Amino acid sequence: DVAPTSAAAGGREYRVSIALKSPADDSAARATFLRWIWYAARREGLHLNGAYDDFSTPARVQMAMRTVVAPALRLSLTDQQSLIPHAKMVRYGTDEVVQYAGEVPTAMTFLIRGSVRLTTTTEDGSVILLSLLEEGSFLGLTTLTRQPSNSGAYALEEVTALEIAREHIEDVVLRTPLLLQELGRIIEDRQKESSRTGHPERVGGQGPQPNPGLLSARPNVK
């Protein structure tokens, strides 16, 4: 596969080029790219085309902490309050990558709304479907061990999540030995799942080989 490229075009604009398998894919690829960059810009606090976003409000963060994070990690009220200032509400578009395999996550991600599919890639490049994570689940656990994640994750629909950076979630987990033990077990289970030989469902080979056709878009990011 050919990775997309980007270059500054002046005037706070950027030109992004995406390799296509066929010119017929132009419209669909452009629509997907613009949708994904809309979500990505808001996650990073960028003002795409001058737009402002206040999705991660204190009220939303507090609600997500109370209804999802606290039950998942069995947090006390004190722990919840200590994490709220360091948590951020984010959204991902359908089919967008939420977690990359082989990278060390910088945060734990708790699913508030929507679902994601965990995947792993075999030596021959085939993508294998692993488990489905739904509301109330979490990913990015290997941020605590500073190890690369064995699995990738992509959104099956619009996903709303709460992210808590490693240094802040780590402080809470290390104070709770039973929680640390349970999270360690989950990490081990997911690693076993991603390396299981069996006969899992495959969702493709090495992927389509792009041709020289390129899609270009020029988002304005401030």
Predicted features and spans:
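A secondary-structure boundary/capping signal
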Residues: E134-E135, A165
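Charged, alpha-helix-enriched surfaces in structured cytosolic catalytic cores
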Residues: A28, T32, W36, P148, ...
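Ligand-binding loop in jelly-roll beta-barrel domains
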Residues: T145-E167
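Nucleotide phosphate-binding site architecture
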Residues: Q99, L162, E170
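Short coil/turn motifs at secondary-structure junctions
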Residues: K21-P23, T121-E123, E158
